[in-house]
């Protein structure tokens, strides 16, 4: 169980730092067994302990339970009276690196147009591609960082971020560099996904095989070379 916290311990070799969070109003997702996968009716269960404590040792949870069983030895403590603690959210599918918006397409959908109809006239992903290619890397980073901070504030602790709105080597590298910079500047775990093959760019409209070859022989090797 991973729980987001403001108070981070400094971990050194042979050095142990313990932090006790006490008087927790309610501690969620505590289970007797260590199930790594929940499915079906199991997902309806959201176990908790009221009036709880949580003990952290060098950034790892080592103990938790009712306040009546709280440890008496620790290095620092945090009174969490009136507050709840729960594991951070894992957001496994996002497209938060983008430029502009497609709000007009929302109106088009309300008016009855299908996604294919919108796509055929240059909307959908192709609309996002055009805007992203024109945006600077600094602009993309700033806007994406703002979106990421909103997600963190709402409790996200692990996030996957896709590229795929560039559809060219230069634009995809730009997106992946933005994601790498976010990885370096924010404490949450960020996983990058190279997601270019979900649409065909205008320059390869009549040569889809050529686009696949470009991905395999040019894009993937260069992205691997740059460690993105």
Residues covered by each model-derived region:
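N-terminal amphipathic/basic-hydrophobic helices that include classical n-h-c signal peptides
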Residues: 1-16
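N-terminal metal-binding scaffold of metallo-dependent hydrolase/deaminase domains
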Residues: 12-70
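Conserved beta-strand scaffold positions in the cores of enzyme catalytic domains, especially
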Residues: 20, 75-79
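Divalent metal-coordination and catalytic microenvironments
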Residues: 24, 54, 59, 82, ...
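Short, glycine- and charge-enriched coil/turn segments that flank and shape catalytic ligand pockets
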Residues: 66-76, 185
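Metal-associated gating/positioning segment near the N- to mid-region
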Residues: 80-142
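Metal-coordinating catalytic core of metallo-dependent amide/deamination hydrolases
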Residues: 128-143, 149, 157-228
